[in-house]
Amino acid sequence: MNNLLLSINWNPNPELFNLFGISIRYYGLLWAIGIFFAYIVVHYQYRDKKIDEKKFEPLFFYCFFGILIGARLGHCLFYDPGYYLNHFWEMILPVKFLPGGGWKFTGYEGLASHGGTLGLIISLWLYCRKTKMNYMDVVDMIAVATPITACFIRLANLMNSEIIGKVTDVSWAFVFERVDMQPRHPAQLYEAIAYFILFLVMMFLYKNYSKKLHRGFFFGLCLTAIFTFRFFVEFLKENQVDFENSMALNMGQWLSIPFVIIGIYFMFFYGKKKSVK
């Protein structure tokens, strides 16, 4: 009882307002804010490097659709393939088809960060093919901005009372009333704070050491830091799907491991290999 009294009761309405029957939710708004800040940061880097403005113009669309498609497919195929392979159009469209007929607009409720990362990496490759830019230069610039977007995405999860933490007795525990009345780790907030700090570190390194660091360093640091933290914070989270209960590590942790390995390679080995050549 004492732990419950010390906890923070959390029960915001995930819907900001309703416009002509279409629900405008904090989730979508915070996603948009995160992408907007990333847009500003990357645009700043393009101008700082004196890159042709015409090359920057299509970048937003490649990133937006790459992240959205990758994150959606990642959620559907990694976390609930049985359902979505039998409800294919719900994987593609932001609606839910009702059993009695008809449909309901829901937005894309399930988005996976690992899938979004893969989608972004692929879309940037397509962008670089079109603009003839160096791929590592572009992913480094995107990497500097990525943590601020990740921060807002986790705040979006917090407003949705989703990706909740395990039951705890810490004094800053949240009671997610839409889930139950148990005090839990605000894991979404842990990630949001960590990613915001990483963003500040990235900006500091870019402004002070970008000319001294090899190509691929920022890309590697971003992958390593985000997915290492993600791996460990998963121990404080409830599993998202039932099949994870029988796993030693959950799906988020297994998917994080290859990204950490790739990140370490680009931080410590990629530049050296290029230098030898």
Swiss-Prot record:
<dbReference type="GO" id="GO:0042158">
    <property type="term" value="P:lipoprotein biosynthetic process"/>
</dbReference>
<keyword id="KW-1003">Cell membrane</keyword>
<feature type="transmembrane region" description="Helical">
    <location>
        <begin position="186"/>
        <end position="206"/>
    </location>
</feature>
<dbReference type="GO" id="GO:0005886">
    <property type="term" value="C:plasma membrane"/>
</dbReference>
<comment type="pathway">
    <text>Protein modification; lipoprotein biosynthesis (diacylglyceryl transfer).</text>
</comment>
<keyword id="KW-0472">Membrane</keyword>
<feature type="binding site">
    <location>
        <position position="154"/>
    </location>
    <ligand>
        <name>a 1,2-diacyl-sn-glycero-3-phospho-(1'-sn-glycerol)</name>
    </ligand>
</feature>
<feature type="transmembrane region" description="Helical">
    <location>
        <begin position="133"/>
        <end position="153"/>
    </location>
</feature>
<comment type="similarity">
    <text>Belongs to the Lgt family.</text>
</comment>
<keyword id="KW-0997">Cell inner membrane</keyword>
<keyword id="KW-0808">Transferase</keyword>
<feature type="transmembrane region" description="Helical">
    <location>
        <begin position="251"/>
        <end position="271"/>
    </location>
</feature>
<feature type="transmembrane region" description="Helical">
    <location>
        <begin position="22"/>
        <end position="42"/>
    </location>
</feature>
<feature type="transmembrane region" description="Helical">
    <location>
        <begin position="216"/>
        <end position="236"/>
    </location>
</feature>
<keyword id="KW-1133">Transmembrane helix</keyword>
<feature type="transmembrane region" description="Helical">
    <location>
        <begin position="59"/>
        <end position="79"/>
    </location>
</feature>
<comment type="function">
    <text>Catalyzes the transfer of the diacylglyceryl group from phosphatidylglycerol to the sulfhydryl group of the N-terminal cysteine of a prolipoprotein, the first step in the formation of mature lipoproteins.</text>
</comment>
<dbReference type="GO" id="GO:0008961">
    <property type="term" value="F:phosphatidylglycerol-prolipoprotein diacylglyceryl transferase activity"/>
</dbReference>
<keyword id="KW-0812">Transmembrane</keyword>
<feature type="transmembrane region" description="Helical">
    <location>
        <begin position="107"/>
        <end position="127"/>
    </location>
</feature>
<protein>
    <recommendedName>
        <fullName>Phosphatidylglycerol--prolipoprotein diacylglyceryl transferase</fullName>
        <ecNumber>2.5.1.145</ecNumber>
    </recommendedName>
</protein>
<dbReference type="InterPro" id="IPR001640">
    <property type="entry name" value="Lgt"/>
</dbReference>
<dbReference type="Pfam" id="PF01790">
    <property type="entry name" value="LGT"/>
</dbReference>
